[in-house]
A protein has these predicted regions:
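Residues at the start of alpha-helices and the adjacent loop-to-helix junctions
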Residues: 22, 33-36, 71, 102
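Glycan-processing catalytic domains of CAZymes
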Residues: 58-365
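Disulfide-bonded cysteine motifs in exported proteins
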Residues: 20, 49-50
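N-terminal secretory signal peptides that target proteins for export/translocation
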Residues: 1-32
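Bacterial N-terminal signal peptides
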Residues: 35-49
Length: 365
């Protein structure tokens, strides 16, 4: 809109001298007044366009396409994917993650937004619905060589006394069923970095012995890279990299949602560059946060600001990583977590409130 007005301005003033030179002085003064009124009207429209929150909606194609190159054969933009919709324990978003047609449509839509992989929240075989949804997603992705999937292993909190053994069992299942040489043809859809499969870790238990787990995974024929949420001082040698995760920062959750995690992101990226240059750094971008629809809600908010939060979070990433020192991956957090309001599937700007959740509850697709 602004570009259109600017073009009109240029057209007016490029012809102004020539046009006015051909008319009498009195008429010239009247023309000046008319033109002045026209320009003032246009400026008012420009100011109104800038003042309305949704006039500057984020265009993910423009916002995300400017990142540096990814390693050959690896997707650069990944999105966290929640596979639990379609069961009664979660809100109705108008689709089931067990519907192959829905999964194919989501992959196609993600690619339109320059996202080339889903990192699927995965709990191991203990949550059968989510495990089946993961398998269906990997199968759908296998039909498109340009799109990949990976697991974000969500550690359990109900294995007191044998946390490490439980994690080993889960990861062995993941490897055998979806990653390893016996996993079947859909294994080609699994995300790899420099030829090695990537597993993201969402930790829950502090008693898990990740050094022991790493010894086990290194013994596999196709050993994976383990990417941990934030940094781990306790097990620095157990992980190949770290990823940032949506949070408000050191000042915590503000009542007005104004804390969007800027200080946390600055610390994460600076710490990765200064103290972990040998590790894989995975950046993050999020549109906001609102867990009011979740059954576990704690009334936590990060204001969306009609796309401004998304832009600000992305700008912090760009301060530290560009074409000269590209991070291999940037995580969009998330694709479809409507219950915590981090979804970008239907709305990045969330103008007028949590429009993603509202359209989801209405069953829009």
């Amino acid at each position: 809109m602004k570009g259109t007005f600017i073009s009109i301005f240029k057209g007016i003033f490029s012809r102004l001298d020539t046009s006015l030179a051909r008319v009498p002085r009195l008429r010239r003064a009247a023309d000046f007044r008319a033109i002045a009124l026209l320009v003032m009207a246009m400026l008012s429209l420009l100011m109104m366009a800038g003042a309305t929150g949704c006039a500057a909606k984020v265009n993910p194609r423009e916002s995300l396409a400017a990142q540096g190159r990814a390693p050959e054969g690896s997707p650069k933009l990944l999105a966290i994917y929640q596979p639990w919709f379609g069961q009664k324990a979660h809100i109705d978003v108008g689709y089931s993650c067990h519907d192959p047609n829905v999964l194919r449509q989501q992959i196609a839509k993600a690619k339109e937004l320059n996202i080339s992989g889903f990192v699927v929240n995965w709990y191991g075989p203990r949550k059968e619905f989510e495990d089946q949804a993961y398998g269906l997603m990997q199968q759908a992705a296998s039909a498109d060589p340009s799109f990949k999937v990976a697991a974000q292993y969500d550690e359990a909190v109900d294995h007191p006394g044998y946390d490490t053994d439980a994690v080993i069992v889960d990861l062995q299942y993941l490897y055998d069923r979806y990653i390893g040489p016996e996993a079947g043809p859909s294994r080609n859809a699994y995300l790899r970095y420099n030829g090695r499969p990537v597993i993201f870790i969402f930790p829950k238990e502090s008693n898990t012995d990740w050094n022991r787990i790493r010894q086990v995974t290194r013994s596999w024929p196709d050993p994976p890279l383990l990417i941990y949420k934030d940094m781990s001082d306790k097990y620095p040698d157990a992980f190949d990299g770290y990823y940032a995760w949506v949070q408000p920062g050191k000042d915590g959750w503000a009542r007005d949602g104004s804390n969007y995690g800027e200080d946390y992101l600055n610390y994460f990226y600076r710490n990765m560059q200064e103290h972990h240059p040998d590790k894989i750094a995975v950046g993050a971008v999020w549109p906001g946060f609102d867990d009011s629809k979740a059954s576990w809600s704690r009334n936590r908010h990060i204001a969306y600001r009609c796309g401004k939060t998304f832009e600000d979070v992305l700008r912090v990433f760009r301060k530290y990583y560009g074409s000269q020192n590209a991070a291999p991956y940037l995580l969009v957090e998330t694709w479809n977590d409507y219950e915590e309001g981090t979804d970008v599937e239907r709305s990045i700007g969330h103008c007028g409130g949590n429009s993603g959740i509202n359209s989801a509850v209405a069953g829009e697709q």
